[in-house]
Amino acid sequence: MEEKKRDVLPCIAVCEGDINPRVLTCGDPARAKKISEKLENVKCLAKNREYHTYSGTYKGVPVTVTSHGVGEGGAVIGFESLCRAGAKVIIRVGTCGGMQKEVTAGSLVIVKAACREDGVTEKMLPLSYPAVADMEVVRAL
């Protein structure tokens, strides 16, 4: 029986079905590499531009780690491709800005909702559509 040829997704350079359902993303490819070093049985799936993708297991759970570069444009392209490749839960880790003085530099922040003033998502959804995290994922974190 002949194996069906799978198309490589543009930008992230992996095929549909290559990505684990749980994905950690970050902007910096070096940070993605560092995170991947915490995984067991890790393998590099692809390195294409700012998208460096690794898969392995963490405490027996399959996890993929990928970078998406700087800015919302690269993140959106990466997230859409990750979903096509099999991602079901995407958690973005890394740095962010803040507006509350009591949240100091270096604080761990688990975001439940965000303002959508990025310049990209309004092209995909009305601004009235809320950017709210899945509460089951938030509770698990």
Labelled PLM ranges:
Residues E2-A140:
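Metabolite-binding pocket within alpha/beta catalytic cores that recognizes anionic/polar moieties
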